A protein has these predicted regions:
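A generic structural motif
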Residues: 64-66, 268, 395
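Active-site SXXK
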Residues: 29-38, 49, 55-57, 80-109, ...
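Short, surface-exposed beta-strand/loop micro-motifs that present aromatic residues
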Residues: 368, 375-385
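Short, conserved catalytic-motif segment at the N-terminal edge
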Residues: 22-82, 102-104, 118-125, 400, ...
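Bacterial N-terminal signal peptides that target proteins for export
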Residues: 1-6
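Short, surface-exposed loop or secondary-structure junction motifs
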Residues: 114, 118-363
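N-terminal signal peptide c-region/cleavage motif recognized by signal peptidases
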Residues: 14-18
Length: 421
């Protein structure tokens, strides 16, 4: 028995490298087949995917239409509304100013935006519908604003059910006709849903970040981002304000309704982009291409630097991609965040802290970070695999199942992380 075991051990050591577990490589054919099935099954009108691995492009696949009614196919230069994938761009902009010493992460928000000095927590409602308000247990800090623990709301998805969402509905802080300064004044009048630090709750806090960029830099938000992120990185197709010529490349958005995909009227989504409205949200609004956003993702993969251009210090990028949530915040107080996978939240980014815990969980590597956008957009950066991925489509409402299946197409259904982890 001992001789047999020793012989087996020797045989294993002598195995050629090809017999060992092969390094992970994305299967471009599998990704293309997945996109084709999405379109063939009527789950979206068109989609594209770009994968960058080990310092080079690994895959670009595009299937279906950018505009079904015009019979215009998805192309490499198609423009997409990325919605909440705007948020990491805003976070990078604000953290550049943090590097310059313009603020501290634990500064009370009111030090830099005085309109928030009188924030109250909504603690129910009186019989006449008026809010019951109380003082928060502590001040909202900029760190809270960066990690969605301020207690802010994003408004109700449907009929308002509490005093904070009713105030949002009445004040409409993010109305397209408002500037970011006007947004912030209105937002400061909306009561907090929770005490600062008590809950993770997705909110308009990233739009507050955009206003902070304006106040701390002395520049309009979109101008700052263009000068300090887009232009240095060569992201020529990215921005909020668009020209009429851009319509020829713009992907239309479609709403899934009663088994059909219905075009979304432009007025519901694109007025700030094409009609000169003043709002430039920090949490949404950028229109870009998969290549431009991949440039941004590659900068993140490069620890803040791309092609010799430094946007952030490596230490700042590590801070952004480290879980910032207090472990004492229970799962039930993290809204829908646990559905993104085994992890937490950094600065405007989900951060994976453990391998997938079940077959139903999104595939990914420990240390990856990502975010997504309302029309089922998605990007992620996987440092362990030296990989960045951008998935682009314009299917509303947000389709989490589509993302889970796309990740399986990229990684394989059984992926748990790099070999040896």
């Amino acid at each position: 028995m001992i001789r047999t075991a020793a012989a087996l051990a020797l045989a294993l050591v002598a195995l050629p490298a090809s017999a060992e577990e092969a390094p992970y490589r994305p299967d471009c054919g599998r990704i293309d087949a997945f996109l084709g099935k999405l379109v063939a099954d009527g789950r979206t009108v068109g989609a594209s995917a770009l994968v960058w691995k080990d310092g080079a492009e690994a895959c670009f696949e595009a299937v279906g239409d950018a505009d079904r009614e015009a019979a215009r196919p998805i192309a490499r230069d198609t423009l997409f509304q990325i919605y909440s994938m705007t948020k990491p761009v805003t976070g990078v902009a604000l953290m550049q100013l943090w590097e310059q010493g313009k603020f501290g992460l634990d500064d009370p928000l009111e030090w830099h935006l005085p309109e928030y000095a009188a924030l109250k927590v909504a603690d129910g409602e009186n019989p006449d519908g008026s809010p019951i308000l109380r003082e928060p247990k502590r001040k909202v800090t900029i760190r809270d604003v960066l990690r969605h623990t301020a207690g802010f709301t994003y408004g109700a998805d449907g009929e308002p059910q509490n005093a904070a969402d009713r105030a949002w509905s009445r004040l409409q802080p993010l109305a397209f006709d408002k500037t970011l300064a006007e947004f912030s004044q209105a937002m400061a009048q909306v009561p907090l849903l929770y005490d600062p630090g008590a809950h993770w709750h997705y909110s308009a806090g990233v739009d507050v970040q955009a206003r902070l960029v304006e106040v701390l830099s002395g520049q309009p938000f979109a101008e700052y981002v263009a000068q300090h992120i887009f232009q240095p990185l060569g992201m020529k197709d990215s921005g909020w304000k668009r020209t009429p010529a851009d319509r020829a490349r713009l992907a239309s958005a479609y709403y899934a309704e009663a088994g059909a995909l219905v075009p979304v009227p432009e007025a519901l989504l694109l007025e700030p982009n094409f009609k000169g409205k003043p709002m430039t949200m920090g949490g949404a609004g950028i229109v870009t291409t998969v290549d431009d956003y991949m440039t941004f993702a590659r900068m993140l993969l490069g620890q803040g630097t791309l092609n010799g251009t430094r946007i952030l210090k490596p230490s700042t990028l590590r801070l952004m991609t480290t879980d910032q949530l207090d472990p004492r915040i229970p799962t039930e107080n993290r809204q829908w965040l646990p559905g993104k996978g085994s992890g937490g939240f950094g600065i405007d980014l989900f951060v994976r802290t453990a391998p997938p815990q079940s077959p139903q969980e999104n595939r990914g590597s420990v240390g990856e970070f990502f975010w997504d956008g309302f029309p089922s957009m998605l990007f992620w950066v996987d440092p362990a695999q030296d990989m960045a991925v951008v998935f682009a489509t314009q299917k509303i409402p947000f389709d989490n199942a589509m993302h889970r299946e796309f990740r399986e197409a990229v990684y394989g259904a059984d992926y748990q992380g790099p070999a040896g982890d």
